[in-house]
């Protein structure tokens, strides 16, 4: 399990770097996984999301059903889907962290990078049902390539035609903050608040965003560029997520305790039969090593965290 760019340990990620030949068409044939959430998201070389198609937006194949719709049968046997991967950029940006009412998608836009034409997708599965494998019992989507002359390719022929073994092209800053810059930020933070900074007591929470506001917890500058106040624009972020971070330090004490009211979410881990509504689709707590590495230590997601009779944990 590769751990960089702040992953959630309750999630499995599969990445693809490829180049669709001129005039060809690519689509994916898959089966909806037995899980809390799945999505396909395309990215640029800076790790910023370009387009996202979440599970509930995907139209199932004729005769199949989408188990991610409210009230749907999560254990339906017929759960296939097909989605086209197009090379053109998306004309209208996807709303960040917003449930899209009454929409369906049969395409995901994955434009090539200006530098080398490489296209990038990440397939995510959050909180697979208990006793399922890494794909939550669904297998991985199958790529199907139709060449300009109409010939259809599958299997290894697709991989060769897509140059799918090409190295991933990305800016290193998409995975973690460069060490030299982070050292400067730490010096600024300690000058502001002492040797435990950027940790504070009580903790200071910051919303991750594009622009320098991501580092407000170091600098104290909470200025957010126009249009980015709801975004987390790099580190291969998920367009359906919002991220809030803080730092802790044992200079403030041996134990850090969090008490809060838990948002409601669908219950899925034990193979629940119906897909329920909730305040959120999913939430989790993650312990990470900070901006220097982007690595995760451990996470707990909602169904793993005990709550009391009043919904507090």
Task: Label every PLM stretch briefly.
Residues 1-313:
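A compositional/structural signature for long, glycine/proline-rich flexible linkers
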């Amino acid at each position: 399990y590769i751990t960089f760019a702040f992953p959630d340990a309750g999630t499995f990620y599969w990445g693809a770097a490829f180049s669709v030949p001129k005039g060809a068409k690519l689509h994916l044939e898959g089966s909806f996984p037995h899980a809390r959430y799945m999505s396909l998201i395309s990215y640029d070389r800076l790790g910023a999301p370009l387009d996202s198609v979440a599970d509930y937006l995907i139209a199932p194949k004729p005769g199949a059903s989408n188990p991610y719709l409210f009230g749907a049968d999560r254990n339906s046997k017929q759960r296939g889907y097909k989605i086209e991967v197009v090379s053109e950029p998306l004309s209208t940006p996807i709303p960040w962290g917003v449930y899209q009412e009454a929409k369906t998608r049969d395409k995901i836009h994955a434009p090539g990078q200006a530098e080398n034409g490489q296209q990038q997708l990440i397939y995510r599965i959050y909180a697979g049902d208990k006793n399922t494998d890494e794909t939550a019992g669904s297998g991985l989507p199958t790529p199907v390539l139709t060449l300009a002359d109409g010939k259809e390719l599958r299997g290894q022929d697709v991989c060769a035609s897509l140059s799918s073994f090409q190295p991933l092209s990305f800016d290193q800053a998409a995975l973690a903050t460069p060490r030299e810059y982070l050292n400067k930020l730490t010096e600024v933070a300690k000058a502001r608040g002492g040797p435990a900074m950027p940790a504070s007591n009580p903790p200071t929470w910051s919303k991750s965003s594009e622009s320098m506001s991501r580092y407000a917890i170091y600098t104290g500058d909470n200025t957010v560029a126009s249009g980015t106040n709801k975004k987390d624009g790099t580190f291969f972020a998920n367009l359906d997520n919002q991220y809030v971070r803080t730092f802790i330090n044992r200079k403030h004490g041996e134990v850090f305790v969090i008490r809060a009211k838990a948002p409601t979410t669908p219950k899925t881990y034990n193979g629940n039969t119906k897909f329920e509504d909730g305040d959120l689709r999913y939430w989790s707590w993650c312990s990470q090593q900070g901006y220097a590495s982007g690595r995760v230590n451990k996470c707990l997601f909602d169904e793993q965290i005990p709550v009391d009779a009043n919904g507090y944990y």
